[in-house]
């Protein structure tokens, strides 16, 4: 089957934003203008196409990035038909892992900002992730019709808060109630959209007299940014020659792809204005899969670096970036194809696990509908049905050309909750449900507490776990009781020690003998967490028992001696020991190592570590004192304060997670609902003695 759309006309883009910037409405309008949805879904009434999971509709926030395919030929049908694969990314801080995952498979992104709220804390997190994956991006300032909307303030905030280089290519005509359209700085005409057909058609008009001077100024700013693309253009510009529209667009595109500038547009998705021009900018300024460098990876057989070009001629390679459970077809695995072609029914290699997978069926997703397709090619984003054992972030590739594409990094969960099924019947269903959900979401973990036998789920925040429990109920019919949220503490050591243990048993029959001497020392926080170094000389412990020593210690790490929490940041050197020809066994050395480790930890000045969160609170000035006082009471360290640009203050602090439970309710009541906050995990640091004592007491009690 030949390719329907040339790969140069593909745009794989993400729509990314802070939680209330109107991203879902923006995505919804994109789907409407690109001809997919006939009735505009409004988030206000819970009907948006991309928010296809029930809880998202209830909470009015986007949780799962749905991948949707649509087509666009330009506002004035001036382009050949382009194929957009749009990935909707969540804006809530508990779902940063989703954003990270979608950034990995995007070629370009549209950052949506609120014209009133501007650059929010979460916008900064998303920006950092886009930088990490070097994603070229445009900015779209939405909600220009709202009270307090100010496009130029957002331009300034992007410079100061994101250290971005925004280049407006349109400016607004009016603001708030009087927002009517935009001035296109390339054509130096105003664009007025037709309200009768929801903005599907438009007319060019003259620039309103009061805006001519401002438009001239911003056009010069844009041309200057374009001229910096090459010496040739700069000479032309400095020589006073006019640059043609094609030259300006080409130069802006070149600099956008290089990450040097971020073209900026504005509008009001809700009022059907501006999204259409932004879609044209996606075509003009964001990359096709062929514009970005070949995807990098490693050959699992040789461990050498390898790469794949975005071409059908190359061997097949794809990344599984999302799992979804569908009640009709079971597991859907969303894949981004980087190279080659694969057909339904083909067998491919999961290079991370070294297993073979048969691709049952392939489907193209349009928000909640799906179309069966026969094959996928380089640049495509689609969902595969029938994969048995594939987890998020794994690579699928041709067996004849194995490659592991870059591993995604997922944060460690910071909060635990115990869940108990309400009935015996729920018990089994709960196990299945939790395993499925953990497969979909690598930042969510499930384990059984050895002492209490309870099932413990861990995640990135209270909302994250609430949604997991909610999904168990809706999708799997599991009713569960949940405990109070618990903090994921860790333990470590503060000084270097030497420890020894001899495990010897002689009681008739075969005895047991294992003897180890280890040196323990603290490691840099935030690194590998555990390192084992074999320094045995002269065979005092035979080779075959060395891995058993490592295993004995690894198996002991999850339960530290302070309060039974996992031990991190410790380096172990195995320096000496002895063995018995007959009685030594792997088990004996495991037991000896485990006891030596516990012994060593007691002497090594053990400490309890607690997760510290980076917290940002935006509050009206009159509540400033209360907010600061409250953060101090919560053992917070206030790092700084800024004006938020709309008459309020933004407080940055680091606060232990243990003190943040229920914070949203307290903040609401202290500020009459006018303050907002966001937090994300920052680091682990040593808990003060009185806190450590209380935690230890509670664990023992």
From Swiss-Prot:
What does the UniProt keyword field contain? Cytoplasm, Elongation factor, GTP-binding, Nucleotide-binding, Protein biosynthesis
One GO BP on record is: ribosome disassembly
Q: Which domain of life is it from?
A: Bacteria
Task: Work out whether the entry's keyword set contains Protein biosynthesis.
Answer: yes
Choose one Gene Ontology CC annotation of this protein and give it. Answer: cytoplasm
Write down the Gene3D superfamilies for this protein, in alphabetical order: 3.30.230.10, 3.30.70.240, Elongation Factor G (Translational Gtpase), domain 3, P-loop containing nucleotide triphosphate hydrolases, Translation factors
**Pfam families from the xrefs?**
EFG_C, EFG_III, EFG_IV, GTP_EFTU, GTP_EFTU_D2
Where do the tr-type G domain residues begin and end? 8-290
| Record-level Gene Ontology MF annotations | GTP binding; GTPase activity; guanosine tetraphosphate binding; translation elongation factor activity
Record localization: Cytoplasm
| Cross-referenced NCBIfam families | EF-G, PRK12740.1-5, small_GTP
Protein family per UniProt:
Belongs to the TRAFAC class translation factor GTPase superfamily. Classic translation factor GTPase family. EF-G/EF-2 subfamily.
Per its database record, what is this protein's job?
Answer: Catalyzes the GTP-dependent ribosomal translocation step during translation elongation. During this step, the ribosome changes from the pre-translocational (PRE) to the post-translocational (POST) state as the newly formed A-site-bound peptidyl-tRNA and P-site-bound deacylated tRNA move to the P and E sites, respectively. Catalyzes the coordinated movement of the two tRNA molecules, the mRNA and conformational changes in the ribosome.
Designated name of the protein: Elongation factor G
- Look up and give the organism this protein is from: Neisseria gonorrhoeae (strain ATCC 700825 / FA 1090)
Gene from which the chain derives: fusA
């Amino acid at each position: 089957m030949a390719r329907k759309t040339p790969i140069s006309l593909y745009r794989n883009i993400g729509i990314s934003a802070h939680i209330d910037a109107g991203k879902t409405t923006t995505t919804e309008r994109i789907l409407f203008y690109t001809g997919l949805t006939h009735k505009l879904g409004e988030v206000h009434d819970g009907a948006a196409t991309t928010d296809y999971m029930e809880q998202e509709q209830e909470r009015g926030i986007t949780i799962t990035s749905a991948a949707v395919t649509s087509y666009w030929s330009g506002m004035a049908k001036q382009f050949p038909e382009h194929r957009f694969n749009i990935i909707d990314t969540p804006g809530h801080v508990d779902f940063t892992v989703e954003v990270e995952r979608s950034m990995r498979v995007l070629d370009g992104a549209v950052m949506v900002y609120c014209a009133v709220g501007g650059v929010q804390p979460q916008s900064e997190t998303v920006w950092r992730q886009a930088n990490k994956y070097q994603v070229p991006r445009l900015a779209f300032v939405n909600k220009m019709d709202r009270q307090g909307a100010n496009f130029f303030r957002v331009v300034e905030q992007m410079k100061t808060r994101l250290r971005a280089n925004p280049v407006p290519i349109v400016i607004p005509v009016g603001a708030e109630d009087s927002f009517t359209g935009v001035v296109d700085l390339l054509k130096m005409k105003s664009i007025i959209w037709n309200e009768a057909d929801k903005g599907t058609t438009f007319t060019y008009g003259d620039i309103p007299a009061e805006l001519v001077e401002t438009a001239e100024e911003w056009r010069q700013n844009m041309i200057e940014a374009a001229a910096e693309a090459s010496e040739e253009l700069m000479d032309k510009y400095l020589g006073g020659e006019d640059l043609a529209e094609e030259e300006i667009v080409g130069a802006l595109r070149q600099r956008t792809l290089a990450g040097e500038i971020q073209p900026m547009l504005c509008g009001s998705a809700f009022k059907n204005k501006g999204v259409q021009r932004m879609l044209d900018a996606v075509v003009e300024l964001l990359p096709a899969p062929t514009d970005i460098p070949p995807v990098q990876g490693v050959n699992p057989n040789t461990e050498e670096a390898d790469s794949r070009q975005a071409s059908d001629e190359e061997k097949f390679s794809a990344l599984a970036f999302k799992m979804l459970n569908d009640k009709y077809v079971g597991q859907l695995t969303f894949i981004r194809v980087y190279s080659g072609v694969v057909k339904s029914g083909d067998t491919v290699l999961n290079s991370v696990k070294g297993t073979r997978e048969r691709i049952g069926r392939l489907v193209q997703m349009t928000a909640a509908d799906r179309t069966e397709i026969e094959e996928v090619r380089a640049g495509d984003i689609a969902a595969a049905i029938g994969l048995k054992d594939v987890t998020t972030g794994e690579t699928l590739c041709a067996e004849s050309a194995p490659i592991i594409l870059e591993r995604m990094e997922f944060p460690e969960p910071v909060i635990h909750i115990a869940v108990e099924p309400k009935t015996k019947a729920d018990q089994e269903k709960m196990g299945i449900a939790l395993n499925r959900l953990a497969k979909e979401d690598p930042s969510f973990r499930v384990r059984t507490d050895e002492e209490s036998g309870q099932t413990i789920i861990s995640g990135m925040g209270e909302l994250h776990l609430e949604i997991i429990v909610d999904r168990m109920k809706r999708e799997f019919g599991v009713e569960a009781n949940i405990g109070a949220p618990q903090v994921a503490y860790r333990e470590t050591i503060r000084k270097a020690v030497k420890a020894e243990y001899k495990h010897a048993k002689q009681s008739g029959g075969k005895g047991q003998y294992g003897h180890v001497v280890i040196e323990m020392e603290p490691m840099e926080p935030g690194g590998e967490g555990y390192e084992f170094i074999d320094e045995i000389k002269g065979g005092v412990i035979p080779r075959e028992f060395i891995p058993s020593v490592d295993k004995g210690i690894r198996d002991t790490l999850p339960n530290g001696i302070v309060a039974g929490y996992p031990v991190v940041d410790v380096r172990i050197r195995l320096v000496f020991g002895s063995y018995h020809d007959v009685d030594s066994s792997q088990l004996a050395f495991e037991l000896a190592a485990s006891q030596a480790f516990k012994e060593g930890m007691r002497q090594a000045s053990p400490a309890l570590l607690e997760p510290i969160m980076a917290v940002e609170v935006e509050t009206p000035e009159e509540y400033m004192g209360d907010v600061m006082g409250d953060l101090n009471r919560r053992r917070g360290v206030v790092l700084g304060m800024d004006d938020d640009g709309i008459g309020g203050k933004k407080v940055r602090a680091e606060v232990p997670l243990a003190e943040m439970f229920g914070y949203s309710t307290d903040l609401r009541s202290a500020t009459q609902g006018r303050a907002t906050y966001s937090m994300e995990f920052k680091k682990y640091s040593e808990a003060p003695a009185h806190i450590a004592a209380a935690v230890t007491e509670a664990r023992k009690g």
